[in-house]
């Protein structure tokens, strides 16, 4: 077992080709985008923060392929990288959520202890967060953890980390271009 929190943040390179990333971004052009809102479970309220990105849960023609890529990354993280005898399975993972960060948008610091996505047929609290990047042609938009460790996720890469209070993270403002990412949560 590792003793540093950063040891449980894993970047998996080359899970998508550049051409597939570009194809997915084109597919996203027709999706129904909405401004991201934070849901506060204790209060039962949702709030805009002011400079939030847009997101969509719409399926694209590549959604099934993306789910397979996410599954392989989860498998690598749980069964190959860490391989703990007491942690060998999970219930499932969410369909990809896409985020689109235009210039001057950001994601405030938070942890992925999400309740609202797992209250229907799928029940649970996320145990792992999966973030994949679809492009590099933007500036800014760095993911920050611990509180000053910078992760620049390249197009085609996935970053996986535990979804709990020990892993607060934020996305710095995009200063040029548009940043496209997808997210999934393992429960």
Can you name each region flagged by the protein language model?
Residues 1-158, 166-187:
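Fe(II)/2-oxoglutarate oxygenase catalytic core
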């Amino acid at each position: 077992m590792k003793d540093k929190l950063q040891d449980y943040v894993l970047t998996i390179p080359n899970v998508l080709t550049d051409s597939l990333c570009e194809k997915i971004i084109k597919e996203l052009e027709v999706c129904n985008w909405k401004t991201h809102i934070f849901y506060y479970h204790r209060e039962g309220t949702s709030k805009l923060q002011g400079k939030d990105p847009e997101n969509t849960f719409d399926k694209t023609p590549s959604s099934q392929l993306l789910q397979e890529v996410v599954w392989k990354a989860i498998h690598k993280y749980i069964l190959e990288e860490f391989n703990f005898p007491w942690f060998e399975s999970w219930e499932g993972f969410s369909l990809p959520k896409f985020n689109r960060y235009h210039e001057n948008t950001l994601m405030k610091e938070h942890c992925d202890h999400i309740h609202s996505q797992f209250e229907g047929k799928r029940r649970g609290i996320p145990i792992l967060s999966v973030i994949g990047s679809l492009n590099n042609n933007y500036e800014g938009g760095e993911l920050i953890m611990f509180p000053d460790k910078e992760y620049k996720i390249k197009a085609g890469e996935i970053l996986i980390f535990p979804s709990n209070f020990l892993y607060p993270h934020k996305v710095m403002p995009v200063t040029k271009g548009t940043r496209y990412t997808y997210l999934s949560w393992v429960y």
